[in-house]
Amino acid sequence: MLKRLHIYFKEMYPFFSRLLLGFIVFGEIYFILLLNYGVTDFSLGIQEIVGGITVFGFLMFLRIADDFKDYESDKRLFPDRAFPSGKVYKKDLNIVVAVDLAVLTILNAVFMNNFLFYLFLMAYGILMSLWFFQKHKISKSLPLALVTHNPVQMVLNLYIISFCCIKYDLYPFTLTSFLVLMTLYFPALIWEIARKIRAPKDETEYTTYSKLFGHKKSTIFILILTLVDIV
């Protein structure tokens, strides 16, 4: 099993780079919020480490959940990937998910001050993995999948912001916290749409925004989102 998981994670979720990303995402929102609130007296400790690990572990859960959800289509479109090719078994990944969620839950219950926000984050992720109980509708509509799934980045941002506000006794309902929440959400939204835009000659059976709306309109929409994010 360990060899199979090594193949999977090397291909789909490289540990070191994703762990580093987890701490970068947590630290980025953490320090931008403190900077804009004018907090200069801050302390780093086990809670910040748990926060970074939570981002890493949650994104790993989403990665595996996506592989479960897309198994049938991946067998046709991406047959060489670790899961659809049989290089790793579903039972292997189920064990990883169980251990991952158990460890994250224990760490957050013991060390973090925003456990309710953690539960909200996990509830949203689990609902995503189940297509919000509307697979027959969402799986057939790329825009509907975007509307229901992409806000998870905002929920993840909210988890980090809530921790900071509680730890440093900051009033949460301000324009500052709202802008931090939305500003750091847009890069994820832009990336999610942009990665599904292709030139006409590169289109395949895979559903893309360029196939649905044309590559020109899709590209213009990305430019508009980028300008909104900058402003």
Q: In which residue ranges do the predicted regions lie?
A:
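Multi-pass alpha-helical membrane architecture of UbiA-family
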Residues: 1-231
